[in-house]
């Protein structure tokens, strides 16, 4: 089963309510769909989200990476030669991780199709259920408390709470959420690089002193500020997660 074509297209899905983080406000999902076609007429699909503030990729750069660099490197490749095909994919262009991920998904889709089994079985998955968290958009403390309560009502037991936009409100936000959902719900905080190291230590210590029992705090400072991350980790008790 040889790769005969790789194409990209764009699609948009409007959100019912804006999704806000310290990095951006999203009103619609604008993604790139990648379709890999083989000589027996099968199609594999992958999706690439453009997240310029995080990966540096845009819709234009993703489509260019796939069509101008990855496509020529993979045409004629055998899907069955998974290691060789993946090596060609990842050496076709430096970085461009979302573009590569979408093609990776499409290739694995085809690999599973040829064998007539679900992909999760090929990858060794055996669970029929997987517990995940639900992300709460950054808003006023009252709105975030209400959104968190709705999520718990839907059965979620782990919440990821976005903060970092107007940091002076962040302690009140988490206090409101904890009061709304009670002590048994796991709370993870994601600042999306929205704090300085000093702010992060002050705010996290405030949450610790208030007994808010956080699972972790994700990316409190700029992603490239490794010294800042280390400073925060040394000066708080809550686990710090790098994104």
Feature map (PLM): residue ranges:
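A short glycine-rich beta-strand->turn/loop micro-motif centered on a GG-aromatic cluster
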Residues: 70, 218-221
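Catalytic alpha/beta core domains of metabolic enzymes, predominantly
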Residues: 54, 224-243
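Short, catalytically relevant binding-site loops at active-site mouths
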Residues: 194, 222-224
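Structural detector of well-ordered beta-strand residues that form the stable sheet scaffold
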Residues: 133, 188, 218, 239-243
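Short acidic/polar active-site loop segments enriched in Thr and Asp
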Residues: 157, 213-215
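N-terminal capping/lid subdomain adjacent to the active-site entrance of alpha/beta enzymes
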Residues: 1-188, 192-194, 198-201, 205-208, ...
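Generic hydrophobic alpha-helical scaffold/packing signal
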Residues: 204, 218, 230-233
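Short loop-to-alpha-helix "cap/lid" segments that border enzyme active sites
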Residues: 206-209, 224-226
């Amino acid at each position: 089963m040889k790769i005969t074509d790789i194409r990209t297209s764009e699609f948009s899905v409007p959100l019912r309510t804006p999704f806000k983080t310290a990095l951006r406000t999203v009103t619609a999902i604008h993604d790139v769909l990648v379709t890999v076609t083989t000589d027996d007429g099968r199609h594999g699909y992958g999706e690439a989200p453009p997240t310029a503030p995080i990966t540096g990729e845009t819709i234009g750069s993703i489509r260019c990476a796939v069509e101008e660099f990855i496509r020529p490197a993979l045409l004629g490749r055998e899907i069955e030669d998974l290691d060789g095909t993946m090596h060609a994919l990842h050496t076709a262009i430096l970085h461009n991780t979302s573009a590569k991920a979408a093609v990776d998904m499409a290739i694995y889709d085809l690999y599973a199709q040829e064998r007539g089994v679900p992909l999760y079985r090929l990858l060794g998955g055996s669970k029929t259920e997987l517990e995940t968290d639900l992300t709460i958009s950054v808003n006023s403390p009252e709105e975030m408390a209400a959104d968190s309560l709705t999520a718990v009502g839907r059965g979620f037991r782990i919440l990821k709470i976005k903060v970092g936009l107007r940091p002076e409100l962040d302690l009140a936000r988490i206090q409101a959420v904890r009061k709304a959902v009670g002590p048994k719900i796991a709370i993870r905080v994601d600042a999306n690089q929205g704090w300085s190291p000093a702010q992060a230590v002050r705010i996290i210590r405030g949450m610790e002193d208030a007994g808010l029992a956080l699972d972790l705090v994700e990316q409190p400072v700029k992603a490239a500020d490794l010294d800042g991350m280390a400073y925060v980790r040394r000066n708080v008790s809550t686990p710090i997660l790098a994104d």
